[in-house]
A protein has these predicted regions:
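Carboxylate-rich, polar loop motifs that coordinate divalent cations or form catalytic acidic clusters
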Residues: 1-683
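Cytoplasmic C-terminal tails of single-pass
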Residues: 688-699
Length: 699
């Protein structure tokens, strides 16, 4: 009964994965008065030339910057001639301002002054949303070519290229639709009966496949027949897929490959194939297995190989002499000198390898062999390096263990090493548990001391957790706990791919990723796999415009017209202000990060940016009189900084006593005071002298 339940669970998860891959992704966000919309009855929509969204309602005009709604309407004493705030329509005029119909009157909303103006001969029509008719749905095509339709009754459908129209989600995904607008970024806005909807269509990057039972992927491997093997921990299975990505079957304990869900006898942590075609499996905690004699690729003979220093096998590598090097967690590195023999001989570190550092390298995670026959081992206590030799001389091999050193800056950044990889130039990269990636700079890998270049948070990388690292074209790809980081070793530039990129929460496993026969990369997850084509590992090219959404001076709210200003002049009694801004990326507003800088010399060559995370305001206090330049920039939806710097010049007016004439006057007053004091002293002394002379003459 339990087996039937597992099979059913797996089948459902596979069906779910297929469905998720076939159905395009869209995010639907609903807004109403609870979110700040000034009134639920929206009569029209428009997007201005900068990208800001505007909505006409029966309670004035409403602006949305991606974070908050703000209303604009007539106020008593503001000089506006609006008799009512019942907006019937809004449209974008050719001059960049907004036209508004208020009942039967026409007004211009001046975006430079943020005021309603009654002018003659104004443009009576412009760009705004399209009405949805009962017999004419609104059509929108997303970035990958899917055709979306919004129907009058609220139905939302999609039609892939060459496919058929299919309902999205429930039969009625939205409230009854009245108007629709496709913005400059490709988002779809729907004005419904009592709310508005924003529908965004994120780029689908790869495919996340959950295995349904929370099993961690421990090993992925491609054999010589272009089949790929996936071993998972909790359910103790080994799945085999053909080059067409079809499931061949499960590896059974007796060596057969069976179609139904079948457990292997223990969790498999590593898989490799030797030159003679044998498949070797490393497990925890049952040691080493050899698979030979494949019959039509459907059955193997399985031999258990004993004699290891530990039965926790994490990696297996074959050197050019045909020997196997086994990484064990607890028994160090072991060598199988004759792997083809019926009973292979195992050389263990604590008896056969006489120079092995027993105290430092007991727990080995991974082994890397270079073309120059240098073995580099990732251990929990450092990087173990040795030069391979031929024949029985392995017993006299010399090992060097490199660890983190407190007083050497170019030492290994973290002793807990995860894996080792080479790039296309043969440079060696070492991933660590919490110290990022290290590149070996020393030419001689077997030197007593190695020098490392660090790629970590201290040097600009987004994370220090590097579960593994692999060569990726002319760059390196680091696998973090929840992200992938592609970086250029020469200049340190990087691209970070996280939750926003995957459109899902991904927790990566320690399994080293592999390139599949179809060109995609396969990454192990804590509960499944992530598949992605190399060309999909790229960043969004959209550069959001930054709008200045408001300013507060000395705690008093100022005009929204700051968005149209190049220069803001503060009075002599105004020394502190808060500037609010928003990058107009409606597909990822809450995921954007910001930074600002304050320049007092106008030099933008070497700007020191203040990163403020997701906060979209900057407060500057107690400014001295003078002219400043405030710079604001943001990331895009993928977290990459883009070239969208917004500049605002701030002129702080000095008080009279801070001006040059006041300083001159003060100097003159001081000189006059000192001059008067000196004159008085001299006068008094002269009088005293005259009195003394008169007294002497009298006597």
């Amino acid at each position: 009964m339990r087996l039937i339940t597992l099979v059913l669970s797996l089948s459902l998860s596979l069906l779910s994965a297929v469905s998720a891959a076939a159905t395009p992704i869209c995010h639907i966000q609903r807004y109403d008065e609870n979110d700040g919309l000034t009134q639920w009855h929206v009569t029209q929509m428009a997007q201005d030339s900068q990208g800001m969204m505007w909505f006409s309602t029966w309670n004035g005009l409403c602006r949305f910057d991606g974070y908050e709604f703000r209303g604009f309407k007539g106020r008593v004493g503001d000089g506006s001639r609006l008799a009512t705030d019942r907006m019937r329509s809004v449209w974008l005029c050719d001059d960049g301002n907004l036209g508004c119909r208020v009942d039967d009157d026409m007004y211009l909303f001046n975006l430079k002054r943020y005021r309603f103006e009654k002018i003659g001969g104004m443009q009576l029509r412009g760009r705004n949303a399209t009405a949805v008719k009962e017999n004419r749905p609104y059509r929108h095509r997303d970035g990958v070519g899917n055709l979306w339709k919004v129907y009058y009754d609220g139905r939302l459908t999609y039609t892939p290229r060459g496919g058929k129209e299919t309902p999205y989600g429930d039969r009625k995904s939205l409230e009854a639709a009245r108007f629709c607008l496709s913005d400059k970024q490709g988002n779809l806005w729907v004005a419904a009966t009592s709310c508005i909807y924003k529908i965004s269509f994120p780029r689908q990057n790869g495919n996340v496949v959950r295995n349904g039972n929370g099993a961690e992927v421990k090993a992925v491997f491609v054999d010589r027949y272009k089949r790929y093997w996936i071993a998972t921990k909790e359910d103790e299975t080994v799945r085999i897929f053909d080059r067409g990505n079809r499931l061949v079957g499960y590896l059974a304990p007796d060596g057969r490959i069976v179609a139904g869900y079948t457990k292997f006898r223990c969790p498999i942590y590593c898989i490799t194939q030797t030159r003679d075609g044998s498949i070797w499996l490393g497990s925890k905690p049952q040691g080493l297995f050899r698979l030979t004699g494949c019959h039509g690729m459907q059955a193997y003979r399985i031999d258990k190989i004993g004699g290891l220093g530990s039965d926790n096998v994490y990696d297996i590598k074959e050197d050019r002499w045909g020997r196997l090097w086994i990484a064990t967690l607890g028994g160090g590195v072991c060598c199988v000198e004759n792997p083809r023999a019926e009973r292979p001989v195992v050389v263990k570190p604590f008896s056969g390898l006489r120079n092995y550092p027993h105290t430092l390298a007991k727990k080995v995670r991974m082994i890397h062999l270079t073309k120059d026959d240098v073995m580099l081992c990732a251990t929990t206590d450092g990087l173990l390096v040795a030069k391979l030799v031929a024949g029985n001389d392995v017993r006299d091999m010399v090992f060097h263990c490199h660890t983190r050193e407190a007083n050497r800056k170019d030492a290994l950044s973290c002793s807990a090493v995860m894996n080792v990889a080479e790039d296309y130039r043969g440079r060696i990269f070492v991933s660590t548990e919490s110290g990022g990636v290290n590149m070996i700079q020393t030419g001689n890998l077997t030197a007593d001391k190695l020098s490392f270049r660090h790629y970590d948070e201290a040097n600009g990388m987004p994370t220090d957790v590097a579960l593994s690292v692999v060569g990726f074209s002319r760059k390196m790809l680091m696998v973090g706990s929840d992200r992938l980081v592609m970086f250029n070793p020469d200049n340190g530039d990087y691209l970070s791919f996280g939750k926003n990129f995957f459109q899902s929460e991904c927790r990566f496993s320690e399994a080293i990723p592999v390139r599949l026969p179809d060109g995609r990369w396969l990454f192990g997850l804590q509960d499944g796999e992530y598949y992605v084509a190399p060309q999909q590992l790229r960043k969004s090219t959209f550069v959001p415009s930054i709008a200045l959404t408001g300013v507060s001076v000395q705690g008093v709210e100022g005009s929204c017209s700051v968005n149209a200003m190049d220069t803001l002049v503060l009075a002599s009694n105004e020394r502190s202000f808060t500037l609010r801004f928003a990058a107009l990326d409606y597909s990822a507003d809450v995921r954007l990060s910001y930074a600002f800088a304050l320049l007092d010399d106008g030099d933008e060559e070497d700007v020191k940016w203040n990163d403020i995370g997701h906060n979209h305001s900057a407060t500057l206090l107690d400014l001295e009189p003078g002219t400043y330049v405030v710079l604001v920039r943001s990331t895009n939806a993928d977290g990459a900084w883009v070239d969208n710097v917004r500049r605002l010049t701030i002129v702080v007016t000095p008080t009279f006593w801070e001006t040059t004439p006041a300083r001159v006057l003060l100097l003159l007053l001081l000189l006059a005071f000192f001059g008067s004091a000196v004159y008085t002293i001299i006068y008094i002394r002269r009088i005293k002298r005259q009195r003394r002379e008169a007294l002497d003459a009298y006597l």
